[in-house]
């Protein structure tokens, strides 16, 4: 599968989702690689969503990321799927995430995830297997790995296969089977 050097950030535009951290990563990353584009998919949400979007757009200018970042707003699911099929990385910097469904969806389409090592994400993402976990927001630690991911097709294909395999753990039938096992275990304990 031939993919482009596209990064994605998918989710509502609000501080909780941490898109400003994504911009900080991109600013750090462009120091070692300039051949990439990051699309932000999702519209402003909540009382401060519009204000946060303006802050993000200002940061894009201040960080000289104009040629690397585009805000696409809300898109139909079919369009999100199409862009995921072209992407090489999902950047997920949400500060609080009870369950990272977007990460599983990206993995199911062969897209690795760069995320923070907190909450449920550390259960979904296995570092350097189906994505990259960073402590806090120290993205410099993964810049070289991400550069390798987008420039080494053989490595990308290995990670892509890992992503698709890992996402199968979260198929509904597997989830139901695990839930039934838990009930059986509780029943006979």
Task: Identify the role of each PLM range.
Residues 95:
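Aromatic "clamp/platform" in nucleotide-sugar-dependent glycosyltransferases that forms part
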Residues 141, 148, 155-169, 181:
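A short, well-ordered alpha-helix in the C-terminal region of glycosyltransferases
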Residues 74-75, 82-87:
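Short alpha-helical donor nucleotide-sugar binding micro-motif in glycosyltransferases
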Residues 10, 37-57:
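Glycosyltransferase donor-sugar binding loop
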Residues 127-128, 132-139, 148-153:
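Conserved acidic donor-binding segment of nucleotide-sugar-dependent glycosyltransferases
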């Amino acid at each position: 599968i031939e993919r482009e050097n596209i990064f994605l950030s998918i989710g509502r535009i609000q501080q909780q989702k941490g898109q400003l951290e994504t911009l900080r990563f991109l600013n750090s990353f462009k120091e070692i690689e300039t051949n990439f584009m990051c699309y932000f998919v999702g519209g402003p949400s909540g009382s401060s969503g519009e204000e946060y979007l303006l802050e993000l757009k200002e940061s894009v200018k201040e960080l000289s990321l104009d040629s690397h970042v585009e805000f696409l707003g809300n898109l139909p699911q079919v369009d999100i799927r199409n862009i995921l099929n072209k992407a090489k990385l999902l950047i997920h910097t949400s500060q609080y995430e009870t369950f990272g469904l977007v990460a599983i969806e990206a993995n199911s389409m062969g897209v690795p995830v760069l995320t923070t090592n907190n909450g449920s994400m550390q259960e979904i993402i296995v570092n350097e297997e189906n994505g990259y976990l960073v402590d806090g927001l120290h993205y410099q630690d993964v810049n070289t790995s991400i550069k390798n991911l987008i420039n080494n097709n053989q490595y990308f294909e290995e990670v892509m296969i890992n992503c698709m395999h890992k996402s199968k753990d979260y198929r509904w039938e597997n989830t139901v089977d695990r839930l039934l096992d838990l009930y059986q275990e509780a029943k006979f304990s």
